[in-house]
């Protein structure tokens, strides 16, 4: 992923790259942007996620942005069931239904701890992010973020 980012952003010499385990990374500089993709859902609890959002906020320069692309839970059990069914249908177009149910769903249940999207937007606002919004969403996948005041 870093190689692809470097290639696509090569014309921007001011862009820096950091490769690190996000759980132990120290956000000790005034970052202009923090971007995450399919990572934060691995934090085990909502409290860990809230604390991590605070760390990101603290590490951003004023006006810095944070955007996260991740798996999210629906705002109700009804919606969550629809999202999971749509996800199963999507995966079944590329792999067998047996593989979906025998490999991918158990992997999701064992490794992923997504949180409700609405809760995450609320946490970000409580922490101090402004212009918090969802810029893309398709069932249980979303891209959302905000700006440090």
What are these regions (language model features)?
Residues 10-23:
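Conserved SAM-binding strand-loop segment of SAM-dependent methyltransferases
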Residues 23-34:
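A short acidic, Gly/Pro-enriched loop at the edge of an enzyme's catalytic core
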Residues 34-35, 124:
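Hydrophobic beta-strand segment of the Class I
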Residues 50-62:
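A short glycine-rich, Lys/Arg-flanked "PGG" loop and its adjoining helix->strand segment in the class I
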């Amino acid at each position: 992923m870093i190689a692809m980012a470097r290639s696509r952003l090569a014309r921007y010499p001011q862009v820096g790259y950091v490769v690190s385990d996000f759980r132990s990374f120290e956000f000790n500089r005034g970052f202009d942007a923090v971007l995450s993709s399919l990572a934060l859902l691995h934090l085990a609890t909502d409290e860990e996620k809230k604390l991590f959002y605070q760390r990101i906020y603290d590490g951003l320069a004023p006006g810095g942005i944070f955007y996260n692309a991740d798996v999210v839970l629906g705002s109700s059990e009804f919606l969550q069931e629809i999202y999971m069914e749509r996800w199963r249908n999507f995966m079944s177009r590329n792999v067998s239904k047996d593989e979906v149910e025998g490999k991918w769903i158990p992997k999701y249940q064992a490794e992923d701890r997504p949180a409700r999207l609405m809760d995450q937007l609320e946490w970000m606002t409580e922490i101090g992010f402004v212009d918090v919004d969802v810029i893309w969403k398709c069932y249980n996948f979303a891209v959302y973020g905000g700006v440090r005041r």
